[in-house]
């Protein structure tokens, strides 16, 4: 019976957690006395903090939000990446010596000069939160939102209310502009928030259903694919979900 790489990796990871190997691998053999501040607790910040702690540095991570994790906590919806998985890793990091300072934005709540006085090294892992915007009429209207803000607020609601999504879109029609993974996450999130209908605009042309001759293996296949959010929308709503070679010129 064939098995997927995902299943193999999941088994290895869960076995390591169950046997305490993850925590064991993070315990430093010695401390070198050097204090490091890591600004940002997204994937890069967490990876950096973990490795520096392994090497014996005294690491403190500064995060402006109320939970560590950055993109993994706020940018990826809970149904795609359950937040307890992120929290599990953060808990182990704390147990092996990494410290987290939350609700603290560098440059607002604490300043660079202060960090320089307290730490011998500073790592900037602040991520890329500036989204691509649309400079079209009506962009400023209420209800027109950037995906990064929408998904962040949706996750904060889930963290506040458990795994139950708010129903702020109940009975409303939603248009998602963009056909990538983030757009797919927005579709799935809107469904869970009670949207009456969801449609999508994609600026590129629809890929072919089969791999073209000029796109042989091992190149990444340029073929049409349907994400989990799109599959859900196709099941729930009538009509064509995605309109290709189309973008918004105004709201």
Say what each PLM segment does.
Residues 35-60, 182-193:
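N-terminal Rossmann-like FAD-binding beta1-loop-alpha1 element of flavoenzymes
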